[in-house]
Regions:
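DPxDG-like acidic metal-binding loop motif
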Residues: 69-82
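Catalytic beta-strand/loop module used to bind and position nucleotide/cofactor moieties
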Residues: 82-216, 240
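Active-site loop/lid in soluble adenylation, ligation, and acyl-transfer enzymes
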Residues: 1-53, 57-61, 127, 131, ...
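Structured loops at beta-to-helix junctions and adjacent beta-edge loops in soluble globular domains
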Residues: 27-29, 37-39, 79, 150, ...
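Short, electropositive, low-hydrophobicity segments enriched in small/polar residues
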Residues: 41, 68-69, 153
């Protein structure tokens, strides 16, 4: 888990290093992983014995947001120069990514949409609820259900968004590991669904990731090509559009 977060952070540094860079990465998890927002409290509020007993990895994201249990999902990251040739301010970049996620889900005949910035709920302390227990502006929903948890980080000249796209209801199990398990479970039951649950058929992470990559290419107006991680100063395969 920590390695995945380090890679995403490194891609952000690479993207910020020149004015015309964009890279997309899809990845998975070798075991269920609890990822925490950059300033979310831990271990306070968590049942660390249960986390250890069930073999969960724990990682802290370079981005904000609240806790996500990564299991049975599709995951991706996109980092880009900002404003870049797409002339995006940081928030516009994040919204472009969310719109691409919604467009990818729409190809599966799901009525996905980005939550508009006008729908702001109450401001809660970091870690007050799991990520999927509520929707926030810039994330993706189908009806009242949150379908994608998207977190972003912005630096001078660069932006990163990475996302958890649950396929099943496994992500709701995050409630089991919280001290407020009953309350968290109730919130998740009312707000969180996986794509398979809404679609009523099986999906693979690869299917979803393929649609995401295609939608991001359209959203940013680029032709993505396979590239070695070394091209971004790393050591694994990525999809990228280097300067």
């Amino acid at each position: 888990g920590e390695l995945q977060m380090e890679i995403d952070a490194a891609l952000l540094r690479w993207a910020a290093g020149a004015p015309h860079r964009l890279v997309v990465r899809t990845y998975g998890w070798t075991r269920p992983t609890l990822s925490l927002g950059r300033v979310e409290p831990f271990p306070a509020g968590w049942d660390t014995e249960a986390i250890a007993r069930d073999g969960l990895d724990v990682a802290r994201r370079p981005t904000g947001g609240d806790a996500v249990l990564h299991a049975e999902e599709a995951t991706f990251a996109v980092a880009a120069s900002v404003p870049g040739p797409w002339a995006d301010a940081p928030r516009a970049f994040a919204e472009r990514v969310a719109d691409a996620v919604a467009a990818a889900y729409q190809t599966f005949h799901l009525a996905a949409e980005r939550v508009p910035s006008t729908e702001r709920g109450p401001t809660l302390p970091a870690g007050a609820t799991p990520c999927f227990a509520r929707t926030a502006p810039g994330e993706v929903r189908v009806g009242s259900f949150k379908l994608a948890g998207i977190a972003s980080k912005f630096t001078r000249g660069g932006a990163l968004s990475h996302a958890s796209l649950p396929l099943t209801g496994r992500h709701r199990d995050v409630a089991r590991y919280r001290h407020d398990a009953s309350q968290a479970a109730a919130l998740l039951a009312g707000h969180a669904r996986g794509a398979e649950e809404l679609l009523g058929e099986r999906l693979s992470a690869e299917q979803v990731q393929e649609r995401i990559v295609a939608a991001l290419a359209v959203a940013f107006g680029v032709a993505l090509r396979p590239a070695p991680f070394a091209e971004a100063g790393l050591r694994a395969p990525v999809l990228g559009y280097p300067a």
